[in-house]
């Protein structure tokens, strides 16, 4: 489930792309988040129109040192609620160590338990050789590469104002020993009502990675706050059976005032 939450908040599709001029994923500096930030999301599943909470995901950031370099240590924890454990127990943890200046990842860790399935993966990115070292070997990667977690925080720093509805923003991600060339399609801005409240939001559709529980194509919709924080506030998507909704339910230590919040629920 946690991987689905990450892919829901920032999803991907295995499609080849040619980089566009001014690709934001190679030229962004952090103005959106700070150390000490915490974001909490509730995951809802729906069947026949009835939503029920299945679990929560929390993202935290701290300022640390990795190989004598200052980094943001981003941790994503996901777990199913106790009543849901009897159906499908989830205890997932994702970590990324991100350079504070370039927002490029140095290390990624995935430690998951999902319904009896266990997996631990460690990825070290060597920026000098453009390689990713994993439990399974050494893999060539592009100079501008992201992992699942770093991509979310990197994307929060995109200046959507310079795009028009329909524009595609490409990037590369390393996942499960493969490089995926992906993009998100910017759809514009609108007001969205969530479990937290009503927001002015930036809207886009990520293309989904084939083989997940999500349907392929541009069927998922993501809304991020239309303010300098650019925090995801809602995600909606159909899945194999029913649909999933992920809503922001709590936040702490945002870098900027949440000025996009129009009213609390």
Question: What is the predicted role of each segment?
Answer:
Residues 15-17:
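Leucine-biased recognition of intrinsically disordered, low-complexity hydrophobic segments
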Residues 19-125, 163-265:
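Acidic, serine/threonine-rich low-complexity disordered tracts
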Residues 4-13:
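Sec-dependent N-terminal signal peptides
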Residues 117-158:
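Hydrophobic, well-structured mid-protein blocks that either form specific transmembrane helices
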């Amino acid at each position: 489930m946690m991987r689905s939450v990450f892919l829901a908040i920032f999803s991907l599709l295995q499609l080849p792309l040619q980089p566009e001029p001014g690709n934001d994923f190679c030229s962004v500096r952090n103005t959106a988040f700070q150390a000490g930030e915490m974001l909490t999301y509730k995951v809802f599943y729906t069947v026949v129109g009835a939503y029920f909470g299945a679990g929560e995901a929390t993202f935290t950031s701290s300022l640390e040192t990795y190989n004598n370099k200052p980094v943001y240590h981003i941790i994503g924890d996901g777990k199913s609620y106790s009543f849901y454990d009897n159906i499908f127990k989830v205890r997932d943890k994702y970590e990324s160590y991100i350079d504070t200046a370039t927002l490029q990842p140095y290390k990624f860790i995935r430690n998951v338990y999902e319904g009896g399935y266990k997996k631990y993966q460690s990825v070290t990115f060597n920026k000098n050789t453009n390689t990713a070292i994993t439990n399974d070997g050494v893999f060539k990667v592009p100079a501008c590469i992201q992992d699942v977690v770093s991509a979310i925080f990197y994307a929060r720093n995109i200046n959507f104002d310079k795009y028009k509805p329909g524009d595609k923003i490409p990037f590369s991600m390393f996942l499960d020993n493969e490089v995926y060339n992906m993009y998100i399609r910017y759809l514009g801005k609108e007001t969205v009502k969530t479990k937290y409240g009503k927001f002015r939001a930036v809207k886009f559709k990520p293309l989904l990675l084939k083989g997940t529980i999500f349907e392929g194509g541009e069927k998922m919709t993501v809304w991020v706050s239309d303010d300098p924080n650019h925090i995801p506030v809602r995600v909606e998507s159909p899945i194999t059976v029913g649909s999933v909704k992920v809503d922001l339910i709590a936040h702490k230590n945002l870098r900027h005032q949440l000025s996009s919040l129009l009213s609390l629920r």
